[in-house]
Each structure stands twice: as structure tokens, then as C-alpha cells.
């Protein structure tokens, strides 16, 4: 039986990297990465080649003719583009329709949230989803909740700074809002099942490992680390004020993706921490299938064990090429072990490609 040919857009990003690993480990897929011609020499692309990933050179902004050529003999497309590039997927979807792609997985991979003005990023994605449906292109939309890797607070000792992307020192509202969590590394394992499953064709799927709250996560971190964590509760009024200010600051011309980062943060906090959107029960209400219902035999990474690895110093940090902006540095007490924390968050390059890659 021949393997399914999967074309991955954004294979060098965090989500894309997880999917690469999950598909390769499964063994039933030929994995091909669509790479911009100008990015071929990057170290991250060399690492893909070393894993045995085939490379096809094409830019999402290329002509339809070139996109169609790049999609020759592809069965499944999985897109992991950055927030600023969501609508660049539309020409790719049109080319996929013309080449007979059997399943298109657009770039979802965020928390649960209904469209219509709550999260700019959600609304950008929904524009793409609607275009796909208008094309009558077979699709699967996958969202993944909030990553383990972004869910835990900083410890005062600085011993886990090496693995952190930000201080994560705020508890939204009363801290008791349930939210779906997923280990980034499990996303690829879920995707190997989802794209092989006829039940998920033309459906929405929430892939998640467990449901927890910020308060419970703080308590667990205190138990495991034997350190006291100061609770910094941020009321709904403050979150809403930030969101309004961030929206006003971001709505400028020309489009500047850097101005949207405070907006993403505020809107995520509002949706997940105040509204409680990122909940499997709400996802089902919105029409999602869940991986816990679809794949009851799936063994997810245990959250407690993951946090133990973070505290031991054996976890792997994410967004290793990012640096924290000067604006955000003041939120991090500088200790001997936290200097490396300043190498996270925003990219060293000013290009929107690296800034917004997922």
C-alpha cells in the first residue's frame, strides 16, 4: 500500500515541527515541505532535509501555475503559516482544488473561540475557512487549545527560565476558568490520526489532552517545585481596557504585524480567561469533534510529568529564536539563570516571516 503524500506549509515552525515528527514517527506518510525559495539555505530547512523530508520550492504568493506545479501528486496539505499570513492560504486552496487534493488542513491550531469580533486571529482564519467551503474543497479544521509549554508560571528562583517564553505571571479573572491544554509535541501525533480518519473529513476537531485552570496549575507548580508563587490576579476590567487599547494601536496603515502582538495577548486572555471559550464542552456546542471522543486509546503526554521535566531542567524550550522586547523585559526580574530568558518572544530579525511564524 502506497503512503499518503502530505505537503506541509510552515514545517520549520513550532507547530509544523511537531507535525513533521508525528507524521514521520507514524510511518504511513511521505512528508514534503513547501519552502520559500529564499529560505532554502536556512539551518531550520537543512534540519528538515536531514530528517528525510522532501523539499518543494514555492512561495504562497507565486502564480497559480507555480502553485499547481508544487501540488502535483499531493494527497493532503497541512498549513502552519503565521498569523499575518492567514489569507495567503487562499490561492493555495484554489490550486489545491484544481489539482484534486483530497484533504486541506488550513492553519487552525489555536484555542477554541467563536468568530465575530472576539479574536482578530480567529476571524482571519475563518475568512480562509469560508473560502475553502466556497471551493467545495475537502478539509479538516484542527484546533489544539493552549500549549503546556505556555501554561505554567515563572518560579522566583529562575530555575525554569530556560524553558519559558514569557513570565506568565498573570492570572486572569479569578483563575478558575477551565481551559483545554495540549502538549505541543502531541499535536503531530494527533494529526497523524486525524488526517487518516474519514470521520474527520469536512469536520472541525479539537485535539487536547486535559482541562485545567490557572489556579490549579499554580498549585501544582508549587507542589512540584516547593516554591511559593505570588498570585497576580488581573480583573476583567483591566483585560478589557488592554484589549481596547491594543486594538486601537494595531489598526494602522500600512499593516504592521508587530503591533498585533499585544492584541493577540489581550484577546487570548479575554477569550480563554474571561469568556471561557477554550472549553471542550463549548467546542462540541460549536460543532467540533474531540480527540478524546475519537481516539480514546490515545496516550497523551502527562501534564504533571511534563512540569516535572521543566523543573528538572530537561524540558525543551520553544521559540528559541525569539527575544523579549524592551517593553516586556521589565516584567522579568534579572537573575543569573534568567538571562537566557531574554532570548525569547520576538525574533532577532525584523522580517514578518520569522515574527509571525507559528
Where are these regions (language model features)?
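Short, amphipathic alpha-helical "lid/cap" segments that border enzyme active or binding sites
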Residues: 68, 184-192, 300-308
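Conserved Rossmann-fold cofactor-binding substructure of NAD(P)-dependent oxidoreductases
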Residues: 53-74
Amino acid at each position: 500500500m502506497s503512503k499518503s503524500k502530505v505537503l506541509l506549509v510552515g514545517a520549520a515552525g513550532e507547530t509544523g515541527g511537531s507535525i513533521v515528527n508525528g507524521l514521520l514517527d507514524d510511518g504511513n506518510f511521505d512528508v514534503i515541505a513547501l519552502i520559500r525559495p529564499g529560505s532554502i539555505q536556512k539551518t531550520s530547512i537543512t534540519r528538515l532535509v536531514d530528517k528525510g523530508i522532501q523539499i518543494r520550492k514555492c512561495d504562497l504568493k507565486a502564480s497559480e501555475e507555480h502553485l499547481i506545479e508544487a501540488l502535483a501528486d499531493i494527497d493532503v496539505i497541512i498549513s502552519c503559516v503565521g498569523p499575518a499570513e492567514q489569507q495567503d492560504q487562499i490561492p493555495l486552496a484554489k490550486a489545491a482544488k484544481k489539482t484534486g487534493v483530497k484533504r486541506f488542513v488550513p492553519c487552525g491550531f489555536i484555542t477554541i473561540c467563536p468568530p465575530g469580533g472576539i479574536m482578530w486571529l480567529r476571524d482571519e482564519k475563518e475568512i480562509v475557512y469560508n473560502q475553502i467551503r466556497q471551493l467545495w474543497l475537502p478539509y479538516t479544521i484542527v484546533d489544539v487549545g493552549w500549549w503546556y509549554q505556555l501554561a505554567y508560571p515563572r518560579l522566583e528562583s529562575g530555575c525554569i527560565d530556560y524553558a519559558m517564553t514569557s513570565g506568565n505571571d498573570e492570572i486572569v479573572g479569578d483563575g478558575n476558568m477551565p481551559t483545554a491544554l495540549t502538549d505541543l509535541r502531541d499535536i503531530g501525533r494527533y494529526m497523524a490520526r486525524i488526517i487518516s480518519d474519514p470521520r474527520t473529513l469536512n469536520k472541525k476537531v479539537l485535539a487536547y489532552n486535559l482541562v485545567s485552570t490557572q489556579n490549579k496549575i499554580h498549585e501544582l507548580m508549587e507542589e512540584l517545585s516547593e516554591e511559593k508563587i505570588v498570585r497576580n490576579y488581573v480583573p476583567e476590567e483591566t483585560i478589557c481596557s488592554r484589549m481596547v487599547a491594543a486594538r486601537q494601536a494595531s489598526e494602522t496603515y500600512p499593516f504592521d504585524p508587530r503591533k498585533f502582538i499585544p492584541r493577540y495577548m489581550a484577546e487570548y486572555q479575554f477569550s480563554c480567561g474571561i469568556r471561557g471559550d477554550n472549553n471542550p464542552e463549548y467546542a462540541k456546542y460549536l460543532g467540533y469533534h474531540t480527540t478524546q471522543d475519537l481516539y480514546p486509546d490515545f496516550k497523551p503526554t502527562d501534564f504533571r510529568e511534563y512540569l516535572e521535566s521543566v523543573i528538572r531542567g530537561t524540558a525543551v524550550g520553544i521559540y528559541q529564536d525569539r527575544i523579549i522586547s524592551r517593553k516586556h523585559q521589565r516584567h522579568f526580574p534579572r537573575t543569573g539563570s534568567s538571562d537566557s530568558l531574554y532570548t525569547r518572544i520576538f525574533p532577532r530579525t525584523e522580517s514578518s516571516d520569522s515574527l509571525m511564524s507559528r
